């Protein structure tokens, strides 16, 4: 139900992959999630001694710059290979006149609904197509979604078993809110998501038994959940995980995430 009925279908389409960059400490991975759309992921190999696995960092504000982002830099310096990209309609691919009032992506999100393919579903397809481009490499994949991108990471993790560990930082705790959203994206809204797939804790449960880390979360108002609120919010989710395969931590800074990834 989540994939087809809610997100409009996120399975990568059989489009030819574009030519990758050379295997160097930094390379560009060019790929096409569907005809007419070309995206580029930048891969930075971890410093020696290199650790096994790759980490995909997602932000709906545009591509995370490894040299400018504390978490990305820490991951790189501790030997982890980091991949960053701008998803469609974000960052370098953003529509110049998209914002209306509280919604920075109002127009593109509205157009996606007209097409029957909610923007969140299109973003998940972008991620899954990148995984196709990486498939020649069998290293375990960790995906980290920052802020609103955490919901994208949750959906990608729920639908694609190639993602071994899903991490969200400061992301939405629940679609249900009695006040207008603050700091969120209209593109995260999909028709019938609550009716046919469930709320954020239900989406998070779909990732089990693979690893899931919730590193801080916010209400629709933008207010950060306390430790007690976080535990209560994801009580349903916890039931589907064994031991430390699920972690909910009110702190979402780089040091806290690094400790969890060890």
Per-segment meaning from a language model:
Residues 211-220:
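Conserved strand-to-loop "acid loop" that flanks and positions the catalytic carboxylate
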Residues 6-48:
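N-terminal cap/lid segment of alpha/beta-hydrolase-fold proteins
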Residues 86, 169-170, 215:
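Alpha/beta-hydrolase-fold catalytic nucleophile elbow
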Residues 184-185, 221-230:
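Short, flexible/disordered intra-domain loops and linkers
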Residues 18-24, 28-31, 36, 72-78, ...:
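Catalytic cores of nucleotide-enabled group-transfer and carboxylate-activating enzymes in metabolic
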Residues 130-206:
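Primarily recognizes the serine-hydrolase "nucleophile elbow" in alpha/beta-hydrolase
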Residues 219-220, 232-262:
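C-terminal catalytic histidine-bearing segment of alpha/beta-hydrolase fold enzymes
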Residues 50-140, 173-187:
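Cap/lid segment of the alpha/beta-hydrolase catalytic domain
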């Amino acid at each position: 139900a989540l994939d087809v009925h809610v997100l409009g279908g996120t399975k990568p389409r059989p489009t030819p992959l574009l030519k990758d960059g050379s295997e160097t400490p930094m390379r560009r991975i060019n790929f096409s999630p569907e005809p007419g759309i070309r995206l580029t992921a930048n891969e930075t190999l971890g410093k020696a001694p290199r650790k096994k696995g790759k980490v995909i960092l997602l932000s709906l504000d545009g591509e995370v710059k490894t040299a400018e982002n504390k978490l990305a830099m820490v991951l790189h310096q501790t030997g982890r290979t980091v991949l960053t990209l701008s998803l469609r309609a974000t960052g370098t691919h953003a529509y110049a006149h998209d914002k209306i009032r509280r919604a920075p992506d109002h127009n593109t999100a509205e157009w996606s609904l007209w097409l029957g393919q909610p923007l969140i579903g299109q973003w998940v397809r972008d991620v899954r197509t990148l995984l196709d481009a990486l498939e020649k490499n069998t290293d375990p994949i960790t995906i980290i979604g920052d802020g609103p991108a955490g919901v994208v990471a949750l959906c990608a993790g729920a639908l694609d078993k190639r993602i071994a560990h899903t991490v969200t930082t400061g992301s939405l705790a629940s679609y249900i809110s009695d006040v207008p959203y603050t700091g969120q994206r209209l593109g995260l809204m999909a028709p019938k998501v609550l009716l046919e797939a469930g709320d954020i804790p239900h989406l998070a449960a779909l990732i089990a038994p693979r690893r899931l880390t919730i590193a801080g979360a916010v209400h629709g108002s933008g207010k950060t959940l306390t430790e007690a609120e976080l535990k209560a919010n994801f009580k349903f989710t916890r039931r589907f995980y064994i031991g430390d395969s699920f972690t909910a931590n009110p702190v979402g800074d780089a040091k806290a995430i690094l400790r969890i990834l060890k």
